[in-house]
Regions:
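Flexible "cap/lid" loop of the alpha/beta hydrolase fold
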Residues: 75-109
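Conserved acidic catalytic loop of the alpha/beta-hydrolase fold
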Residues: 41-58
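Gly/Ala-rich beta-loop-alpha elbow adjacent to hydrolase catalytic centers
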Residues: 61-70
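Short beta-strand/loop motif that positions the catalytic acidic residue
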Residues: 165-166, 172-174
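Hydrophobic, aromatic-rich cap/lid helix
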Residues: 131-160
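Conserved HGGG/HGGXW glycine-rich cap/lid loop of the alpha/beta-hydrolase fold
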Residues: 1-41
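Catalytic active-site module of serine/aspartate enzymes centered on a nucleophile-bearing elbow/loop
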Residues: 194-224
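Conserved alpha/beta-hydrolase "acid-adjacent" motif
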Residues: 179-185
Length: 224
């Protein structure tokens, strides 16, 4: 039986970004499996389950919507040695952060992803988040990207009650000063999950160390 780590990207992102940001959390000797997650969170839970089938799952690591899916997978009986939940975006019913994702989808539908990305890039030149956004968006056509973002915006995240049911050793990692993935949400998740460890990565730290989120998670899980 193969030992694997399932890596789950966020809405509008891609497996390459998940591997880059979360890969350092994968223990030595474990095979990373970066899945494609282009649907609503319930469908992404099924993707994680399919990837895990027939393997020993050492780690499930998700970022943004991928973190939501990883948590729900564990709640629903998925078995892993550990969880890394990075940059969760909301808890329970879609909130104003989800609405921002929906508005991004509307803008792309109206103007096209190239125009929207150019505007974002001009407003935040050199920002690593924008660079990773570009990496992800360029793997979609406009219709597919709009569909993925709208699916994410309408997805319910894990509730506090569901998070409290997780029994897998868990690290929750926030990115400081990120309005789309508020630190307060990560704190809520870590407080709700029994025994979870919380880490905060500086907003600009991944600019020079893309693996900072994954590395922080691995350090936290070693202490769990």
């Amino acid at each position: 039986m193969t030992d694997i780590a399932v890596l789950v990207h966020g809405a509008g992102s891609c497996p390459a970004t998940a591997a880059l940001l979360l890969g350092p959390a994968v223990p030595d000797g474990v095979t990373p499996v970066a899945v494609t997650a282009r649907a609503d969170v319930e469908s992404v839970v099924d993707v994680v389950d399919a990837a895990a089938h027939g393997c020993r799952v050492v780690l499930v690591a998700g970022i943004s919507l991928g973190a939501h899916a990883a948590a729900l997978w564990a709640v629903r009986g998925g078995r892993a040695d550990s969880l890394l939940l990075a940059m969760p975006a909301w808890t329970g019913a879609p909130d104003p952060v989800a609405a921002l994702t929906g508005r991004s989808a509307d803008e792309i539908a109206r103007r096209g992803r190239a125009a929207v990305l150019a505007e974002i890039s001009a407003a935040a030149e050199g920002d690593w988040v924008v660079e990773e956004l570009r990496r992800g968006w360029e793997t979609y056509d406009d219709d597919a990207l709009v569909a993925a973002l709208r699916a994410a915006a309408g997805s319910t995240g894990p509730t506090r009650t569901e998070l409290a049911a997780i029994r897998t050793p868990t690290a929750v990692v926030a990115l400081a000063d990120d309005p789309l993935h508020p630190e307060s949400v990560a704190r809520t998740w870590s407080a709700a999950i029994p025994g979870a460890a919380l880490g905060i990565v500086g907003r600009h730290e991944p600019a020079t160390d893309r693996g900072a989120l994954g590395r922080t998670g691995r350090t936290l899980l070693r202490g769990a």
